[in-house]
Amino acid sequence: MNGLRIKKEAAALLAFLCALVFAGCTGGGDTSSDTVLVNAKAEKFKEFRVEKFNLKFSTPDDWQEDNKDTELDWYCENSSVGMGIFGYYRSDFADSANVTDILSQQSKDNMERYQNVQKVEHTPEFVSTDKKITAELYSAEYEGAKIYQYFCYVEFKENDEFFWVTFSSQPSYMKKNFKMLEKIIDSFEIEKGGEK
């Protein structure tokens, strides 16, 4: 699978970045007020662009880009959740390649560094008409903390690009914010006129 950009080093870096986010989340005390603040800010969104793939999407206003020292195509976060993106081109794979299988393998490779990995039942509420979105939710443990890894596979019906997206956070945050995370994924759009 030479064409497949499964980067174990990048997945390890993502795990490290997630650990930093989790460390900030577990500073002790009640974090419910933090979650309320995040939800309150979720009303105001800002736009990000991943120019390499002509991708644009929106996140809540408190999210920040953090693409230093990462092999991911994009990484951003707020104080409670990290989001990583790998982009691919369908034309770089054999016609017989299954996009979902490619993206699922990326998720499996990413989960290798965690302990007690379990798939969690979750029914996303995507209503997209211009793309196919597949989601998988996993519970795991990392450095003594329980985390959720929420993987979303985004395939555009009319475009060559497709994406592997992961959200990493504590279960308590994730359970309260699935709709907001899914709104981010549903905002994915390919801008016309860009170059490959």
Task: Describe the residue ranges of each PLM region.
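Conserved polar/disulfide-associated segments of primarily extracytoplasmic proteins
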Residues: D69-W164
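N-terminal targeting sequences that direct proteins away from the cytosol to non-cytosolic compartments
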Residues: N2-E77, A145-K146, S168-K196
